[in-house]
């Protein structure tokens, strides 16, 4: 299960802010790389683990610990998949406008559902029309696994511990 929490902090000191900003920028570059390389036809049928394994095999260095870039990869791939599924809804509408033959409808819907739409010229044209190559506009987001994030209370205030760029070190953020 995926859970999104957005926390606000009014009294974060400059060095912690700069650390978080640097980490978000590095992770934003990874997100952009994912969208650039897999945000089109190249990403159809690929899972985040296949890409992760390929990058590990190639020895790609992102200058961030493994967990943050893997979570960013997973999140970006799920965003691309959601974008592709939204395009499929538009294609379904085009399919229903094009034909009324139940057999042909079923064939086209099945190809679309199984991501085999490249085998049919009409579906390929429609997907190219509605599933244009996406781009990333998010460079200020850090995806943190639930088991890597801790909260604690100090002097009556709630604090959040998140991983930093330094291995086995955390950034403690006061929540207001």
Region spans (language model):
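Nucleic-acid substrate recognition interfaces
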Residues: 1-176
